[in-house]
Amino acid sequence: MLFRSGLAHEIGRRFEPDELLPEAAQGALALQVRAGEEYLAAAADDGETRERVEAERTVVAAVGGGCLAPVAAHHDGSTLVGLVAAEDGSWLERRSGDDPEALGRELAEVAAAHAE
């Protein structure tokens, strides 16, 4: 967005996902259209981005996370990475895998083990 707005010079530092994992679907746009006018949104659909976003959201949902939970996921096209952490920052677990549901379950198990 900053690049398209001509504000790229305002970027002080760009974080890579291995430094700071973003929330699922960060940067993706969603379109809502009236029933019967789905063709309008279809023109803007990028299948690869949609698949990545769906994988990221599946990880977060399997963990049981939401907008306020310390859960993140990122798919760069080749690697799916998920993260779960304690709300107080006392622990953090980052894992990667190919199956979004399995990765989410793994992270949910980690969170449950820390909750005991």
What are these regions (language model features)?
Residues 1-116:
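Small-molecule-sensing regulatory modules
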